[in-house]
A protein has these predicted regions:
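Charged catalytic and DNA/RNA-contacting regions of genome-maintenance
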Residues: 1-291, 304-307, 311-317
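Conserved interaction-surface patches within small, structured recognition/assembly domains
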Residues: 296-299
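C-terminal helical "lid" subdomain and adjoining coupling/linker elements of P-loop NTPases
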Residues: 320-325
Length: 325
């Protein structure tokens, strides 16, 4: 109940019996984005996100100020990991249009817990950013890089190449060649997103080390053929549910998502929320849809079979945690 209301709840385990010296050890820390409840799975995803927002003022060589965004999101139910980085240079970097891409990323992955790391010296501007980007999560942690704290020191650590290598190779033991991996995964070309990713991995590990086991390799949302969505398009067109309202007709995505397996519903949502402008690809998809609709009787038996398939991605995570039953 406390976690669902946005609280962070540490759980301590007590050893020893009456008459003997008792010891207590922190078992796990539960929070909205790190709560893996195997007994009560109401949603098909549970995502925690970290957003690094860094501004650079104008100077002798720069006529206008810039703002950089590094985004990382991890779904603890499936182990999927998504990253995104972008920057904007403008005379006015504090208006809602500047945060359109952050709002898009947040709307797509809809985290239940969010970490905001920033270098602003005005707290009011962070409140504005939360409003601009529509961050309506159960729990929001705000970390200033300008204020000395354990968390800000960890943020600084996540910028160091040696620490980045250490944390990545610790959590992904299938990486044989680190340099090749960060090149092929685009981490080396997106340092702000990499920094955000490292901090998020450590944050989750501190809550529950099991949640960082067997995560999928990070993939970037920076796709060249992706349709640009501005002015909060996904929310304004009601493609996604802007207020987390329940029900089939709470958004267009939920209304048209008729997939019968959890994996299918997640994949369908991912496709709908990542529209592309690649014409050959779209034509191929239209042909496939047209063929299936025209020959639906050939596929109807498959749909009935699919209804018996359980959530394999979630089951795999349960196996990792030794909670399968």
């Amino acid at each position: 109940i406390l976690v669902n209301e946005g609280f962070t709840v540490p759980v301590w385990h007590e050893n020893g019996t009456i008459g003997k010296k008792k010891t207590r050890k922190e078992l796990h820390v539960f929070s909205p984005g790190t709560n893996f409840n195997v007994h009560e799975k109401k949603e098909e995803t549970n995502t925690i996100a970290c957003y690094v927002v860094t501004k650079h003022d104008k100077g002798f060589m720069k006529k206008n100020p810039s703002i950089y965004f590094g985004c990382a999101a991890i779904d603890i139910f499936t182990g999927n990991t998504k990253l995104f980085q972008y920057s904007i240079t403008s005379s006015n970097i504090h208006n809602h249009n500047v945060f359109d891409e952050l709002e898009r990323f947040n709307s797509i992955y809809n985290p239940s817990e969010t970490i905001i790391i920033h270098n602003y010296d005005e707290e009011k501007k962070i409140d504005d950013i939360i409003q601009f980007a529509g961050l309506q999560t159960k729990s929001i942690h705000v970390i200033s890089e300008l204020i000395d704290s354990d968390q800000s020191r960890m943020v600084e650590k996540c910028e160091q190449q040696a620490y980045q290598k250490s944390i990545l190779t610790d959590f992904y033991n299938d990486i044989n060649d680190y340099d090749s991996f960060i090149e092929s995964s685009n981490l080396s070309r997106n340092p702000i997103a990499y920094k955000s990713f490292c901090f998020l991995l450590d944050f989750i590990f501190q809550h529950n080390p099991n949640l960082t086991h067997k995560l999928n390799h990070p993939t970037f949302d920076n796709i060249n053929n992706r349709l640009v969505l501005a002015n909060h398009s996904l929310r304004q067109l009601n493609i996604v549910n802007p207020h987390n309202v329940k029900g089939q007709f709470s958004s267009i995505e939920r209304m048209i998502n008729k997939c019968v397996t959890p994996m299918g519903r997640r994949n369908f949502r991912d496709i709908i929320l990542h529209p592309v402008n690649d014409i050959p690809y779209l034509k191929r998809q239209y042909k496939i849809v047209d063929y299936v609709v025209s020959n639906y009787e050939k596929f109807e038996f498959m749909r009935k079979k699919f209804k018996t398939i359980r959530d394999f991605e979630h089951l795999y995570r349960k196996i990792i945690f030794n909670k399968i039953s």
